[in-house]
C-alpha cells in the first residue's frame, strides 16, 4: 500500500517547490510521455490558465514524489474549453456559471511504478484517489458540475468510480 498525501491550493498558497515540481511533472506527463504540443520552458509546463486564481490538487507519495495533479478553473473566468476548444461542445453554449468548474491537466502517472503506460494513469488507485479528492475540493468551492476536455480514459475512470459523465460531443 502506497501512502498518498494530497495538497490543494493556489499558486499563492502552495509551497513554491511543490509548484515547480507540479510544472515539471506536467511536462513529463503531457509533453514527454503523451507528446502534446504545449508551452514548455526548461522542462516546466504552464499555460495562460495557470493564474493566481487557478486551483490545484496535487498528490505525492511517501517519498514526496508527485504522483498526480489536477487543475480547477471557474467557468466565470477564461478557461481551456471555453477559450481554446469551444468547438468540442458540439454547438452547446459555453458554460459560464459559479457552480460549473473546469477540470484540466488531470494526470496520475507514478513514474516509479512498474508500469507507466499512458492508459494506466486513468485506472490506478492514485487516479481514483486524485479524482475523488478533486471532486471533493471542487464541491467545497461550490461546484455542482465539472467540465473537462479529456481523453476517453477519463470518462471510463469517472464511470468506474461511480460518477455520472455526459459527453458534450463525439470522442
Regions found by a protein language model. Name each.
Residues 78-80, 86-171:
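Acyl-donor binding region in acyl/amide transferases
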Residues 9, 20, 26, 62, ...:
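Homeobox/homeodomain signature
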Residues 2-48, 56-60, 66:
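Short amphipathic alpha-helix that is part of the acyltransferase structural core
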Residues 22-23, 30, 56, 70-72, ...:
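Long, contiguous hydrophobic alpha-helical segments, chiefly transmembrane helices and signal peptides
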Residues 22, 55-69, 139-146, 167-171:
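Short, Lys/Arg-enriched charge-dense amphipathic segments
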Residues 42-91, 101-108:
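Conserved donor-binding loop and adjoining core beta-sheet/short helix segment
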